[in-house]
Amino acid sequence: MSDKQWQSPPAMIEDLDDVVRATITTARGDIVLDLYAGYAPTTVNNFVFLAREGFYDGVTFHRVIGDFMIQGGDPTGTGSGGPGYRFADEFAGNPLRHEAGVISMANAGPGTNGSQFFITHSPQPHLDGRHTVFGKIVEGRDVVDAIEQGDVMERIQV
């Protein structure tokens, strides 16, 4: 679990591809995601930065709701923690929607994105325009379905 905090969102990574592959390693298996920097560049940049910093290592999935989603990325495990900064939503020009198996930013309202994210079990169209979708599962749907509250992200590799 990370106790790192920053004052502002990270600078943009110059060599970030339009599609970035990320792997979340858990005791239940790996969740492999394609992250779409072409649609949500700030969000993907933030996720990559935090993953490379080890911010997510040892952090739990603190909220799990069956047939809805699994949520993690809060180093306190309470649902109120983050990296020390917030950044804006990315809806304009982003065609990604809350289908089954997407990764999206958890937030407390407009412009409050930080480190918390969720992965959907099923379509959640009521979240479109409220949370930035920035990727999709390419492997490990069964792992997402098996995750229980309190399960740990051992690490995220990008």
Where are these regions (language model features)?
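Cyclophilin-like peptidyl-prolyl cis-trans isomerases
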Residues: 1-158
